[in-house]
Amino acid sequence: MPNIKSAIKRTKTNNERRAHNVTIKSAMRTAIKQVEVSVANNDAEQAKAALSSAAKRIDKAVKTGLVHKNAAARYKSRLAKQVNGLSA
């Protein structure tokens, strides 16, 4: 346990930020899974809607620095490839 006042504040802030980051990343992962489930069910309309939502969540995670932009591009590319494979 830190004794210095600023260290106590930093510990509190870090815990709050970690909780926030976990929430954002979890929402991103859930959105990605929704796309994959829609693709598995061969539901093209649902998959396209889920892809749009997932891309939005992924981009927000990049904006806050939770995911590297190249990793995000990879996620979105793979999901788009799966969704486009349904309509072909």
Curated annotation (Swiss-Prot):
PANTHER family: 30S RIBOSOMAL PROTEIN S20, SMALL RIBOSOMAL SUBUNIT PROTEIN BS20C. One of its GO terms (cellular component) is small ribosomal subunit. HAMAP family: Ribosomal_bS20. One of its GO terms (biological process) is translation. It comes from Bacillus pumilus (strain SAFR-032). Gene3D superfamilies: Ribosomal protein S20 (1.20.58.110). Binds directly to 16S ribosomal RNA. InterPro entries: Ribosomal_bS20 (IPR002583), Ribosomal_bS20_sf (IPR036510). This is Small ribosomal subunit protein bS20. Keywords: Ribonucleoprotein, Ribosomal protein, RNA-binding, rRNA-binding. GO terms for molecular function: small ribosomal subunit rRNA binding; structural constituent of ribosome. Belongs to the bacterial ribosomal protein bS20 family.
